[in-house]
Curated annotation (Swiss-Prot):
Keyword Cell inner membrane: yes
Marked site (Reversibly protonated during proton transport) residue numbers: D60
Pfam family, one: ATP-synt_C
Chief location: membrane
Annotated protein name in UniProt: ATP synthase subunit c
GO molecular function: lipid binding; proton-transporting ATP synthase activity, rotational mechanism
Organism of this sequence: Shewanella sp. (strain W3-18-1)
Length: 84
């Protein structure tokens, strides 16, 4: 039983860590491309900014889903029920 709990804790840590890393890399690429496009065509900056915020919200949603799944595994671990 302790093995299942410890492996679940490791899986949760990896899940949250990779979600944070992916979100950080995504924001870095998104911000860089937004600045590059705004510098190239300044008249499109407001339209690009709206699209950037939409994509930023979707990037945040991915990490929030990972946190939700991780909390599910921490507090309602389905693997403990199989042990008996």
């Amino acid at each position: 039983m302790e093995t299942v709990i410890s492996f679940t804790a490791i899986a949760v840590a990896i899940m949250i860590g990779l979600a944070a890393l992916g979100t950080a890399i995504g924001f870095a690429i998104l911000g860089g491309k937004f600045l590059e496009a705004s510098a190239r065509q300044p008249e499109l900056a407001p339209a690009l900014q709206i699209k950037m915020f939409i994509v930023a919200g979707l990037l945040d949603a991915i990490s929030m889903i990972a946190v939700g799944v991780a909390l599910f595994f921490v507090f309602a671990n389905p693997f403990l029920a199989q042990l008996g």
